[in-house]
Amino acid sequence: FSAVRPMIKESLEAAGLTVQYDEKASSDVYSTIDGNVDAFDIVIAPGDPSVFGDDADLLLRWWYAGDTWTNSRMHWKGQDSYNQVQDLLEKAQQATGQAQKDLWHQTFDVISENVPLYPIFHRKTPTAYDGETLVDFKPIAVTGLSFVGVGSTK
């Protein structure tokens, strides 16, 4: 985080905000802000559920459906945009193919226009392997490697 702190500060100040950092451990941050609407103006915190995969429904629900973030931390639950996102998530869960993707895109649009929680970094997960020595190895879309059913020529 320290490497990007100046860039975040500069961007927020360019938007007209006065920035004062009060850096804390995650557990301290959450115990301070949970349920206290006046505890902060902006919180920048790490979190990356993409380690569980790239399923759009899982990732959207992680942040925007459960009470921990929507009610205790963002104080967004119950607002019209919250209800709209929940409706879109339910419709997307029932849909398939392009119709499902279109509903997820609509959900992201509502989130980006209304919700006070939005990612500022997006992770890329590289995987490197030697295809000559690992038989039947396939990269996976999450952090880590899976060697189930894989053999080696060495």
Task: Please annotate each region the language model reported.
Residues 41-46, 95-130:
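Bilobed periplasmic-binding protein-like "clamshell/Venus-flytrap" ligand-binding domains
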Residues 6, 10, 38, 42-46, ...:
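Feature representing long, continuous alpha-helical segments
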Residues 32-39, 60-90, 121-154:
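Short, solvent-exposed loop/beta-turn-alpha elements that line the ligand-binding surface or hinge
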Residues 1-10, 119:
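Bilobed "Venus flytrap"/periplasmic-binding protein-like clamshell domains
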Residues 9-20, 150:
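C-terminal amphipathic alpha-helical "assembly" element
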Residues 2-6, 24, 75-83, 95-102:
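Soluble non-cytosolic domains of exported or imported proteins
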Residues 12, 33, 92, 100, ...:
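Hydrophobic, well-ordered secondary-structure elements that form the walls
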Residues 15-68, 103:
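Periplasmic binding protein-like
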